């Protein structure tokens, strides 16, 4: 949840120190909104399994409801006097990354996007016999229509950074493999003459948020 990056010297503080107005939220099933029955060991491997399965049974995927939570956060920011509505950005990390991608695609008020530790693609999950914590990102039959690289492609020309994409086990994916899987997105940005607006990169070990995202924070 948000508490992991909200401590002294964390990502949130670094953003604030660079002059950004930050709204950090725990979407449903994460952090402060996590179910009390989700024990640490179970949660580590299966994530918000109970919430995800309940959501699927009602025909409302958890990832979609989380995207809605993020859009409501954009509503809050847009209504504040100290926020320039033309400069709203979204940063989704780990389990918050996929719903942030959906939210940004559906809400053009989000002008640029950074996704750190996001599952590289749904297709990668199909190819792996073992995966960890993917239930909360599941959409039934999604690959009949699209995959995550297709969503990034549809974000063009808005700037998108993909940092430390992960495989279905949560391990860092090789940058070369990520580049291959996101060829469709790179083509979309290239056709829009904004090739530089899509960046796929690792986060150096020990690198601070400010060091990693200096260009992204300045990008307008």
Regions found by a protein language model. Name each.
Residues 18-21, 85-87, 108-112, 157-159:
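Loop/turn elements at helix/coil->beta-strand transitions in domains of secreted/extracellular proteins
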Residues 49-60, 65, 110-159, 169-174, ...:
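Mobile cap/lid helix-loop segments that gate and shape the active-site cleft of serine hydrolases
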Residues 89-100:
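Gly/Ala-rich beta-loop-alpha elbow adjacent to hydrolase catalytic centers
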Residues 27-30, 95-96, 119-120, 166-169, ...:
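Short, glycine-/Ser/Thr-/acidic-enriched flexible segments
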Residues 135, 168, 183-220:
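C-terminal catalytic histidine-bearing segment of alpha/beta-hydrolase fold enzymes
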Residues 26, 91, 116-117, 163:
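Alpha/beta-hydrolase-fold catalytic nucleophile elbow
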Residues 76, 102-106:
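Active-site signature of alpha/beta-hydrolase-fold catalytic machinery across serine-
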Residues 1-80, 85, 93, 120-132:
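Cap/lid segment of the alpha/beta-hydrolase catalytic domain
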